[in-house]
């Protein structure tokens, strides 16, 4: 059969793109599965589970999700769509031991804890996956969720705070998290030994360096809550500039001088790197424990697909397709498209260089 001829995988970009034109959706999927099963053993194997639902849609969000969904859509996704897609890739699940699983979206914790557990139980050898990650929002994460994640030994819980300014939350259609709510959440997660991250977004107000003073107060307050780490993003819809990035780097260096139990694990915070950080829209991770921890999007220049990682991405639909990759083959499920990947070595090499300089070794 044409698609089982593995010489196809050695073709050029042009030939692979030609294949996309005449292969059936079934053949494209089969080609991707064969590539995944026969890819480099050195590549980490990642399972990504997408959640297409949110409690409400933030105005700046570019992720594939919606807030106005019906109960029937919700039930169909968890009772039919996900189980079917997991079964559809049973050949991979039966032959591959995944290194990481990442639940993203959308908001995975919009599903009740028992619904999430039913998904965990559908995934073969789920408990054997060493690195388990999940995204959450503070208003959907429950005690039942936290207990479930502890039960299944999740490595990393990322919680989207984004801003502690009520006016900013209103402006961008986000639910506000009060200081008391944040304190209660942090205390519970710490007391239960759950490794958790808080996300914050810079430049949400005026979109320039005038925002830095108030943003520094937010970071200091969040760090006082003692999360395992926090991730700093710039507002993606604003104009990235060297001036703003240098200002943010200076701010973070100042913050770390007062919170010496934290280090920036994925950046040297060197102003001379600002131009490159603007180009690749850098994220900065301030970490207080388990400095060697990382997952497939941990790089300062986060990108998907990621060189060195084969990613099987489920939870897709025609409305919200997801991207899977194996070595240099990219497969967009939901759209049934194949393409050739060209990785930017600057992203991967910069990440390794930073970790080596900081003495943070990767395996």
Each language-model region and where it sits:
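Short, small-residue-rich loop/turn micro-motifs
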Residues: 51-58, 161-163, 234-236, 318
């Amino acid at each position: 059969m044409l698609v089982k001829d593995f010489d196809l995988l050695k073709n050029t970009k042009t030939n692979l793109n030609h294949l996309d034109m005449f292969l059936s959706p079934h053949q494209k999927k089969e080609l991707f599965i064969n590539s995944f099963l026969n890819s480099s053993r050195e590549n980490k194997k990642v399972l990504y589970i997408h959640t297409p639902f949110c409690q409400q849609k933030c105005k700046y969000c570019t992720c594939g999700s919606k807030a106005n969904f019906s109960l029937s859509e919700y039930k169909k996704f968890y009772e039919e769509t996900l189980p079917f897609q997991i079964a559809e890739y049973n050949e991979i699940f039966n032959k591959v031991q995944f290194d990481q699983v990442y639940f993203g979206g959308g908001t995975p914790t919009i599903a009740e804890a028992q619904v999430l557990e039913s998904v965990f139980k559908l995934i073969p050898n789920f408990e054997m996956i060493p690195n388990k990650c999940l995204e959450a929002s503070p208003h959907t994460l429950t005690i039942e969720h936290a207990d479930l994640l502890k039960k299944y030994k999740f490595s990393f819980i990322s919680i989207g705070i984004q801003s502690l300014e009520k006016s900013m939350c209103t402006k961008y259609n986000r639910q506000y998290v009060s200081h008391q709510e944040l304190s209660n959440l942090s205390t519970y997660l710490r007391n239960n030994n759950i490794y958790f991250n808080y996300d914050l977004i810079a430049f949400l107000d005026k979109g320039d360096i005038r925002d830095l003073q108030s943003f520094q107060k937010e970071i200091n307050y969040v760090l006082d809550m003692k999360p395992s780490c926090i991730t700093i993003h710039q507002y993606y819809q604003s104009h990235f500039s060297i001036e703003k990035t240098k200002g943010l780097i200076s701010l973070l260096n100042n913050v770390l001088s007062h919170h010496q139990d934290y280090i920036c694990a994925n950046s040297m915070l060197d102003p001379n790197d600002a131009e490159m950080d603007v180009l690749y829209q850098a994220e900065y991770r301030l970490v207080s424990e388990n400095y060697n921890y990382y997952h497939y999007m941990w790089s300062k220049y986060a990108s998907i697909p990621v060189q060195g990682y084969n990613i099987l991405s489920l939870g897709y639909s025609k409305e919200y397709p997801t991207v899977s990759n194996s070595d240099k083959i990219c497969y967009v499920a939901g759209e049934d498209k194949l393409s050739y990947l060209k990785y930017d070595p600057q992203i991967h090499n910069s990440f390794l260089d930073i970790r080596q300089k900081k003495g943070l070794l990767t395996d």
